[in-house]
Design a protein with these regions (language model features):
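Short, glycine/acidic-enriched loop or turn micro-motifs at the edges of active sites
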Residues: 47, 67-69
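Nucleotide/phosphate-binding catalytic cleft detector across ATP-hydrolyzing
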Residues: 1-61, 76-192
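Short beta-strand scaffold segments in enzyme catalytic cores
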Residues: 62, 69-74
Length: 192
């Protein structure tokens, strides 16, 4: 989060007596970012993509399901070619419960059946299966645009709840971000 990066960096420097590495422009990643403004690409997306190119077959789509859901696309030449951002499952559920007075907060877990028999089941089914169907459709459209099949990997706090309900094969890697940060650190540590 850009607003707190500098404060955290200064605090880490003070405590550790070393300058921390901050993932951003100028840090070696091995990733060629083909975006209109590569510097705007979030460090989390860069780290995920770096781990993805080291761990999985290319081309690749990485779905990160957190507050926002993101999809990052890496082609067979290790180029980060773009992606998409859409409201995360928790944000969608919060908006639904805040705007519809009859609907209360629920836990995010799959109901026993897709067709709900009460309000809570209907909300759970809607949240889980609409997200799963969206991911299936997004992957189909990415493959159509690229003209080839892709490997799909999901990560992030909510991926485990949705991926089992997708029809597409989507691999789950909950440590993808940390793997990417380690790879980037190893590429740059000689210079620190």
């Amino acid at each position: 989060v850009p607003q707190i990066t500098n404060a955290v960096k200064l605090a880490a420097e003070k405590v550790l007596k070393k300058e921390p590495m901050v993932l951003g422009p100028g840090v070696k990643t091995g990733l060629n970012i083909l975006m209109d403004n590569p510097g705007q690409l979030g460090a989390d997306l860069v780290a995920n993509a770096v781990a993805g190119i080291h761990e999985y077959s290319l081309p690749l789509a990485i779905i990160d399901m957190g507050t926002a859901s993101t999809v990052s696309v890496v082609d067979e030449k290790k180029h980060y070619v773009g992606g998409m951002i859409f409201p995360g499952m928790g944000v969608s559920l919060d908006a639904l419960t805040a705007r519809a007075s009859q609907l209360s907060g629920i836990s995010i877990e799959a109901p026993k059946r897709i067709i709900g028999k009460n309000t809570i089941e209907c909300m759970k089914s809607g949240v889980i299966y609409s997200n799963a169907a969206a991911l299936d459709g997004i992957v189909d459209r990415i493959e159509e645009e690229l003209g080839q099949k892709i490997t799909v990997v999901a990560t992030g706090g909510l991926a485990r709840k949705i991926i089992p309900h997708c029809k597409r094969e989507i691999l789950l890697d909950e440590d993808l971000l940390l793997k990417g940060l380690l790879i980037i650190y190893e590429k740059n540590r000689k210079e620190l």
